[in-house]
Amino acid sequence: MSSNHQSIFSPRYFALSIGIILSVMAVGFEGLSVTTIAPSIAGDLNGLSLFGWIFSTYLLAQIIGTLVVGRIIDKRGPAAPFTYALLLFIAGLVAAATAGDMYIMIGSRALQGLGAGAMMTCVYTAISLSYPDELRAKILGAFGTAYVLPSMLGPYVAGLIADQWSWRFVFWGILPVLVVSAVLSLPAFRKLKVQQTGGASGSSSTWMALLLTMGTGLFLIALSMLPSMMGFVFGLIGLVGMILPLRQLLPKGTLTLRRGMPAILATRGLFFAAYASTQNFLVLALIDVRGITPSQAGLIVASAALSWCIIAYVQGRWDAADQGRGRHMRIILGVFLLAIGIAIVFWIPVVSIAVAVMGQIIAGVGIGLAHPVSGVVAFSQTGEGGAGQTSANLQFADSFTPGVVIGIGGSILVVCQAAGMSLQSGLIVAMGFHLLLIVISIIASTRISPQSIKNADPKKEGVPVIVQ
C-alpha cells in the first residue's frame, strides 16, 4: 500500500505511534504537573529556599540528555538509548515519589531531566527513520497534540491528586503509562537501523554539553541575583559559557540565521521560546493584574492549547494534499499568526477578556502550524546517519531556549520592580522582549529555502536526503 493511503495508525505503524504518543504524554504531564505541585513539595520537604532548583535542575540535566544521546543514536541506533532513558526517567519518578528531603528531590529531578531529554530525542529519531515523508507531518501533529493535552488537563489533575491524596501519587501515576509505552515502542525501536557516519567525536560533544550546562546554570543563578553588580558579572560569564559551546553543538550558522537547517532551528527555538514564556507571564498578568481566578486564567490559556490541537491535525491533511509544497509558507504563516497572538497578549492589562481569548486562539493556531511543520522540514534536510543529531537539535530547541527565555523574562520583572515600576509595567516590558524574539523568528523563517523543503525523492520512504 502506498504511503499516501496509509495512516499513522495503520497496522504497520500502530504500535510505534501509540508508544510515541504515550511517551510524549508522560513526559509532558510530568513536567507540567510539577509546576502545580512544586509549592506543596517544597513545603512538605522544608525546602522553600531551594524551590527554583526543582525546575532548574531538570532543565540543566535535560541539556546533557538531549545533546549527548543524539550522537550516540547516530552510532548505535535509538533502541538502547531509549531503554536507558526510560530507566533513568523511571528511577527519577520513584526517587521523587519517595523523597524524604529536598536534596533527594532535586537529585530525582536531575534523573528525570536526563531521561526526558534522551527519550524525546529518541522519539524524534524514530519519527525520522520509521515514517515516510508523507506521514511525518501527521505523526508530528499527533506528537504536538500529545504534549498539549497534558497542558490542558495536567495542572488541574495534579492539583486534584495533591489535594485529595498526596503529591507523591502524581509521580507514581506516570509509571504505568511508561511501561505501556515501552512495551509498544521497544520492538519497533530495535528494528531501526542507522547509517554510521563520522563527525564530531562523542567525547568532545559530551564536554561541550557539560560546558553548556555549567554556563546555563551560572546564567540562571545570576538572573536570580539581579539587579546587583554580581548578578550582571556572573550573568555575562554564564552567557559566554553558553554561547561558546552552542557554536560547537548546533549546526554552523544557527546563531546568525544561516539559510537552511540553521535557519530552521533558529526559527523554531525563537518562536517556541516566545510562546512558552508568554504563556507563563499571561497567567501572572491575568491573575495579579486583571484579578481573575486561577481556574478562569487556566481556561483562557487552554483556548490556545485547544486551537493548537485542532490545527496540528489539520496541517497534516494539508501536507498530504499539497505533497509538502506549502510547508515553507505554513511555517511563515504560523510564526506570523503567533506574533499577532503575542501582540494581543502585550495589551492584556487593558483589553477585554474576550480579546485575550481571541489572542490565545490565534497564538495556538500559529504554534500548531509552525511547530510540526518545522520538524518535518528539518528531517527532510537530514542526511543519512544524521537523524539522531537532528532529533537532538529539535528537542534542544524545544527545551533549552524556552527555559532560558523564561528565566530572562523573570529577571526583567525583578529589575523593573527594583526600578520602582509596577507589575503591570514590568509585564509589558517582558512581553516586549517576547515580541522582539518572534520578530527575529519571522526573519529567520524567510531564510528557509522553499527549494530545500521538498525531498529529492518522496517515494524513498523514511530516508531523508541532504539538500545542497
Locate predicted features.
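Extracellular/periplasmic helix-loop-helix junction of adjacent transmembrane segments
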Residues: 37-63
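Helix-loop-helix hairpins in multi-pass membrane proteins, especially solute transporters
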Residues: 70-203
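Intrinsic disorder in cytosolic terminal tails and internal cytosolic loops
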Residues: 1-12, 194-198, 446-468
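12-transmembrane solute porter fold
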Residues: 13-29, 34-36, 55, 67-68, ...
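Structural signature of transmembrane alpha-helices in multi-pass secondary transporters
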Residues: 27, 55-58, 62, 89, ...
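Hydrophobic transmembrane-helix bundles of small-molecule transporters
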Residues: 163-268, 274, 279
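MFS 12-TM fold signature
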Residues: 62, 86-96, 112, 177-181, ...
